[in-house]
Amino acid sequence: MSRTVMCRKYHEELPGLDRPPYPGAKGEDIYNNVSRKAWDEWQKHQTMLINERRLNMMNAEDRKFLQQEMDKFLSGEDYAKADGYVPPSA
Protein backbone atom coordinates (compact mmCIF):
# COMPACT_ATOMS: atom_id res chain seq x y z
CA MET A 1 0.00 0.00 0.00
CA SER A 2 1.42 3.40 -0.95
CA ARG A 3 1.63 6.23 1.52
CA THR A 4 -0.73 9.16 1.17
CA VAL A 5 -0.24 12.84 1.87
CA MET A 6 -2.54 15.83 2.16
CA CYS A 7 -1.50 17.46 -1.11
CA ARG A 8 -0.73 21.16 -0.84
CA LYS A 9 -1.72 21.74 -4.48
CA TYR A 10 -4.94 19.72 -4.64
CA HIS A 11 -6.07 19.96 -0.99
CA GLU A 12 -6.92 16.27 -0.80
CA GLU A 13 -5.37 12.98 0.32
CA LEU A 14 -3.43 11.50 -2.59
CA PRO A 15 -0.60 8.99 -3.01
CA GLY A 16 2.75 10.53 -2.05
CA LEU A 17 6.26 10.28 -3.40
CA ASP A 18 8.43 7.23 -2.68
CA ARG A 19 11.32 9.38 -1.43
CA PRO A 20 12.24 13.07 -1.11
CA PRO A 21 13.07 14.56 -4.54
CA TYR A 22 15.72 16.89 -3.08
CA PRO A 23 18.13 16.67 -0.18
CA GLY A 24 17.50 18.70 2.96
CA ALA A 25 14.48 20.54 4.31
CA LYS A 26 13.04 21.42 0.88
CA GLY A 27 13.00 17.77 -0.16
CA GLU A 28 11.39 16.70 3.12
CA ASP A 29 8.72 19.40 2.77
CA ILE A 30 7.86 18.23 -0.75
CA TYR A 31 7.92 14.58 0.36
CA ASN A 32 5.50 15.27 3.21
CA ASN A 33 3.14 17.75 1.51
CA VAL A 34 3.07 17.12 -2.24
CA SER A 35 1.37 14.22 -4.01
CA ARG A 36 2.87 12.05 -6.73
CA LYS A 37 0.27 13.52 -9.13
CA ALA A 38 1.33 17.13 -8.41
CA TRP A 39 5.04 16.25 -8.61
CA ASP A 40 4.63 14.45 -11.95
CA GLU A 41 2.71 17.45 -13.32
CA TRP A 42 5.43 19.79 -12.06
CA GLN A 43 8.15 17.77 -13.80
CA LYS A 44 6.30 18.05 -17.13
CA HIS A 45 5.70 21.76 -16.61
CA GLN A 46 9.32 22.30 -15.55
CA THR A 47 10.55 20.67 -18.77
CA MET A 48 8.24 22.91 -20.79
CA LEU A 49 9.51 26.04 -19.00
CA ILE A 50 13.16 25.06 -19.47
CA ASN A 51 12.65 24.42 -23.17
CA GLU A 52 10.30 27.27 -24.09
CA ARG A 53 12.13 29.93 -22.07
CA ARG A 54 15.54 28.47 -22.94
CA LEU A 55 16.57 28.32 -19.30
CA ASN A 56 20.17 27.35 -18.57
CA MET A 57 20.48 25.33 -15.38
CA MET A 58 24.12 26.44 -15.10
CA ASN A 59 22.82 30.02 -14.64
CA ALA A 60 21.96 30.90 -11.02
CA GLU A 61 19.18 33.32 -12.06
CA ASP A 62 17.48 30.65 -14.19
CA ARG A 63 17.70 28.12 -11.34
CA LYS A 64 16.25 30.68 -8.93
CA PHE A 65 13.38 31.42 -11.34
CA LEU A 66 12.60 27.72 -11.72
CA GLN A 67 12.71 27.20 -7.93
CA GLN A 68 10.27 30.08 -7.40
CA GLU A 69 7.94 28.72 -10.07
CA MET A 70 8.08 25.24 -8.51
CA ASP A 71 7.06 26.70 -5.15
CA LYS A 72 4.14 28.55 -6.78
CA PHE A 73 3.05 25.53 -8.84
CA LEU A 74 3.13 23.10 -5.93
CA SER A 75 1.27 25.55 -3.67
CA GLY A 76 -1.57 26.04 -6.15
CA GLU A 77 -0.66 29.68 -6.80
CA ASP A 78 -0.54 31.41 -10.18
CA TYR A 79 2.66 30.31 -11.95
CA ALA A 80 4.53 31.07 -15.18
CA LYS A 81 3.36 29.27 -18.28
CA ALA A 82 5.03 28.77 -21.62
CA ASP A 83 4.11 31.53 -24.07
CA GLY A 84 1.36 30.46 -26.44
CA TYR A 85 0.75 27.12 -24.71
CA VAL A 86 -2.85 25.93 -24.77
CA PRO A 87 -3.53 22.86 -22.62
CA PRO A 88 -5.23 19.97 -24.41
CA SER A 89 -8.99 19.85 -23.95
CA ALA A 90 -10.48 16.78 -22.34
UniProtKB/Swiss-Prot annotation:
It comes from the Bacteria. GO terms for biological process: cellular response to oxidative stress. NCBIfam families: PRK05408.1. Transmembrane segments: none annotated. InterPro entries: Fe_traffick_prot_YggX, Fe_traffick_prot_YggX_sf. This is Probable Fe(2+)-trafficking protein. GO terms for cellular component: cytosol. It comes from Pseudomonas aeruginosa (strain ATCC 15692 / DSM 22644 / CIP 104116 / JCM 14847 / LMG 12228 / 1C / PRS 101 / PAO1). The keyword Hydrolase does not apply. Belongs to the Fe(2+)-trafficking protein family. Could be a mediator in iron transactions between iron acquisition and iron-requiring processes, such as synthesis and/or repair of Fe-S clusters in biosynthetic enzymes.
